[in-house]
Amino acid sequence: MTAPGFVDFPDSPFHLYQPYPPAGDQPAAIEGLAQGMRDGLMYQTLLGVTGSGKTYTMANIIARLGRPALVLAPNKTLAAQLYAEMREFFPKNAVEYFVSYYDYYQPEAYVPTRDLFIEKDSSINEHIEQMRLSATKSLLERRDTVIVGTVSCIYGIGNPGDYHAMVLILRAGDRISRREVLARLVAMQYTRNDADFARGTFRVRGETLDIFPAESPELALRLTLFDDEIESLELFDPLTGRVRQKVPRFTVYPGSHYVTPRDTVLRAIETIKEELRDRLKLLTAEGKLVEAQRLEQRTRFDLEMLQELGFCKGIENYSRHLSGAAPGEPPPTLIDYLPADALMFIDESHVTMGQLGGMYRGDRARKETLVQYGFRLPSALDNRPLRLEEFEARMRQCVFVSATPAAYEQEHSDNVVEQVVRPTGLVDPQVEVRPARTQVDDLLGEIKLRVAAQERVLVTTLTKRMAEDLTDFLAEHGVRVRYLHSDIDTVERVEIIRDLRLGTFDVLVGINLLREGLDIPEVSLVAILDADKEGFLRSERSLIQTIGRAARNLNGHAILYADAITASMRRAMDETERRRTKQLAFNAEHGITARGVNKAVRELIDGIVAPARHDTLESAIAPEVLADEKSVAREIRRLEKLMTDHARNLEFEQAAAARDALNALKQRVLLDGAA
């Protein structure tokens, strides 16, 4: 086996880190899909089984073709997993993350039956907002960019032309007045704050301007002026103030995707007034006087805000006026920032394509009510996600990636490439059917065998009630078990899966949450209860996906508890057996001995997963922190800043954790002093 190292390809800006050379079906899949791209094929499908290294195949195709890429995943958890893997394969290139930046989002809505208007309410995750801004910056600046995203990318963001026009380019030696720089920064939605220097703010001290770029995770820019000339540009650490490097040139990107030049705002105000006049005439003619008064009051307030500040709350509802688009035209989205020759990969496409098709209809139904009852102008209907046909019109050359392609991929694909043989030699799990009458007792016996071998178990049920009852039953019998359900937020889900891998507990019970892409090599048994209840949770695709969760383990085994074999079960078992036969034949022909996957448990996204818990907070204090008084004082200041930052972002659990760590450190210092 070749040693791990970086691989470069001709005319490609990517430096691919290869921990191992492609193996199994990977070389043929990489060559087949890359050749299809070169031949101009629009749609291709990678039919890759669980654990066959589909992400590695995607990375190899991107590196060989040397074109920017967008990789879409069906949810934030899988996007985070893909992002972490892509960063490992391309550590020297721009790998970016573009998902919804809302931790919590309540869209504005009106319920006519109760005359209830619900105001828009949301909580934005600052870390993800910074990553979104970084993603568009990379697309505009460099070719070696891989964006990992979710369906969030079909929702409207600012027009690429306006966004690019607002960029501020600073060069050492250029002539520009301090007043002009400040005016440009305010127009780019940066705020002046001399006390609290955070992302998207700037501060002024005499002839020195400090700017904290909105897309920068850790470095800020210091601009020193001499009269009206830029004397120097320096990147520095905002916490310590230490200068990291001098730069001859720096580009400051807008503080938001929704920035708009002043003349565009003034033009939009006139067209909004025009639309308001027409709409008020119509509502009055129909005798809807309450709706007319409501619409006029709300819109006039927004117009005043736009006139004075250049933006208003809910500015996205006027996006059609701001972009100058015609009624019914699709909004600008992340797809518009992609170069024409970009590549697209749609991971778990059997789920993601359905999502892309469904987003528009739900959004439209809610907004039509708001327009009908005078809460919004009709142009608000054009602030929407793309329809499926609009997304298709904007698609670049695309590879659908799935172990179970749906009808859409089968109809559209010009080329289907199978990736069934795994590089590790692992084969699909053995599938066994057992009677459902005694499923719970039988499962308990199987769990005890797996726990004794230090292996993990996934159990999938049909209903929430059954999942809860089963969790209680297993816990009463001494099994370390957790229950994963839809009420658990993204971050906690990632933590639960990590704890399962680390052995904090042994059995995870869920309903529809243990399927696509979950990468848990420690799981050796997947138990599917009531497998004969035909429906979307027990369809052929669902069963194949769930069985696949045990395919990363050497002793992988799947048990279907059923009293009859349904058509879906039969097809799923036949497909698993077909793949298993092909894998065993390949191993025998090449003399391969299957080996288990030893994958390090890592954090998916820096700063998103909470730190590891300790039995006592005192035990969590690193010895070097207590080395001397300076170190202790530095750590206390760090924790205090962390606590206030979290509290400001309404991240109260993290703020409480920082407070507890701070109290524990102070307690430890007091005890040591007393001793």
UniProtKB/Swiss-Prot annotation:
SUPFAM superfamilies: C-terminal UvrC-binding domain of UvrB (SSF46600), P-loop containing nucleoside triphosphate hydrolases (SSF52540). Residues 439-605 form the Helicase C-terminal domain. PROSITE patterns: HELICASE_ATP_BIND_1, HELICASE_CTER, UVR. Residues 35-192 form the Helicase ATP-binding domain. One of its GO terms (biological process) is nucleotide-excision repair. The keyword Hydrolase applies. A motif (Beta-hairpin) lies at residues 101-124. The keyword Cytoplasm applies. Residues 633-668 form the UVR domain. It is found in: Cytoplasm. One of its GO terms (molecular function) is ATP binding. Its main location: cytoplasm. GO terms for cellular component: cytoplasm; excinuclease repair complex. ATP binds at residues 48-55. Gene3D superfamilies: 6.10.140.240, P-loop containing nucleotide triphosphate hydrolases, UVR domain. It comes from the Bacteria. Disulfide bonds: none annotated. NCBIfam families: PRK05298.1, uvrb. The UvrABC repair system catalyzes the recognition and processing of DNA lesions. A damage recognition complex composed of 2 UvrA and 2 UvrB subunits scans DNA for abnormalities. Upon binding of the UvrA(2)B(2) complex to a putative damaged site, the DNA wraps around one UvrB monomer. DNA wrap is dependent on ATP binding by UvrB and probably causes local melting of the DNA helix, facilitating insertion of UvrB beta-hairpin between the DNA strands. Then UvrB probes one DNA strand for the presence of a lesion. Belongs to the UvrB family. This is UvrABC system protein B. The lineage of its organism: Bacteria, Pseudomonadati, Pseudomonadota, Betaproteobacteria, Burkholderiales. The gene is uvrB.
